[in-house]
Every structure is written in C-alpha cells, then in structure tokens.
Amino acid sequence: MSGLFITLEGPEGAGKSTNRDYLAARLREHGLDVVLTREPGGTPLAEKVRELLLTPSDEGMAADTELLLVFAARAQHLAQVIRPALARGAVVLCDRFTDATYAYQGGGRGLSVERIAVLEQFVQGDLRPDLTLVFDLPVEVGLARAAARGRLDRFEQEGQAFFEAVRQAYLQRAQGAPQRYSLLDAAQSLEAVQRDIDALLPGILERCRG
C-alpha cells in the first residue's frame, strides 16, 4: 500500500475542516492509517507562523513577507509531518496546501504565479497532492458563515473583491487539471456535500491500494 496525499481547499466558510474529519472517519472504517493536518501549521513551529499570519496587527504585513512565511511553515510541515507519513504509507489529509498560496497570495494579493512556482519547487521538489478536493461556494455565503463563527482573523477581514479573486484562482486551477481536482458545491447542505464525498470514496480507496 502506498501513501496518498489528499488536500482540501476552498475559501472561508467552505467547510474544509468538517469534511476533512468526515473523510478521515470514512477512510479509517476501511482500516487505513490517516494523518490529519493543516496549513499554515501542522507542527509546533509552523503553528507559531500560523499565528503570525492570522493575527491582525497594526503594523500590517507586506505581501512578500506573507508569501515567504507561508512557505517557511510549509517546509517545516513537509519535513516533520507530511513526508514521513507518506513514506510509511499513510493517507495524509491536509486542510489547505499550495493551492491556497496560489489562491490567496496569487489571486488575492496579486503576487505573480511565477514567483510562487519558484518557491513551490524549492520547498516541495516534485511533491504534489495526489488529489485535491476544492469546496466552492459564493463569496457572500462563505463570508457570512465565517462571520457567524465569531471574531475574524486577518484574512477573513479582507473585502469581497479579495475573496472573489481567491475563488476565481481556485476555479482556474481546478479547471486546468481536472485529473487532480474534484470540485464540490459547498453551498449545499452538509449532508449533500458528504454524499458527494462518499461518491469519491471508491476511487480514493482504489488509489490507496493500487
């Protein structure tokens, strides 16, 4: 059995964490070793970087600083969690990965795709997710869900135009490589989204055991 790297992507309020946990439970029913993690974060050091990235500050943060912090946390996460788990044959379910960088720092902040790609290759080498689930929903729906959770983090405080750009970046990436991406309608009820995940389960299990 080989390791499998699955990432879950989408804007604020898309339900990635909830559905990551649901998918993990379904995979564990089949006896699979599943590792749950997230970005930014996933290790003690990377979680400290996450706090820097998400905490609002009077000083502000340059877009390039944000980008470099994201990849610094990712390098630690890969070395300490993701690569070792894949090497032992586990299924890694990660709440956000490099697609989020292309969406938020590329789409939202307007940084060049080429610059992100250079850092991606430097930090990850040839490692890319085997499957990416993109949870898509209208921006206003996602922001309303995020606001209902309580205090907004630094990204959640951005305006609608920022998140429209994030959404479009996700959709462009999903449409550009349909063999890797599965696009799910996250505006549906949770039960409907999870039925869509169940429909993907046989293919995921086949890849795990292939």
Curated annotation (Swiss-Prot):
Keyword Kinase: yes
Protein name per UniProt: Thymidylate kinase
Family according to the record: Belongs to the thymidylate kinase family.
Signal sequence segment: none
GO cellular component terms, A-Z: cytosol
Residues the entry annotates as binding ATP: 10-17
Enzyme Commission numbers on file: 2.7.4.9
Stored CDD domains: TMPK
Function: Phosphorylation of dTMP to form dTDP in both de novo and salvage pathways of dTTP synthesis.
Ion transport listed as a keyword: no
InterPro entries recorded: P-loop_NTPase, Thymidylate_kin-like_dom, Thymidylate_kinase
GO molecular function: ATP binding; dTMP kinase activity
Keywords carried by this UniProt record: ATP-binding, Kinase, Nucleotide biosynthesis, Nucleotide-binding, Transferase
Pfam family, one: Thymidylate_kin
Catalytic activity entry: dTMP + ATP = dTDP + ADP
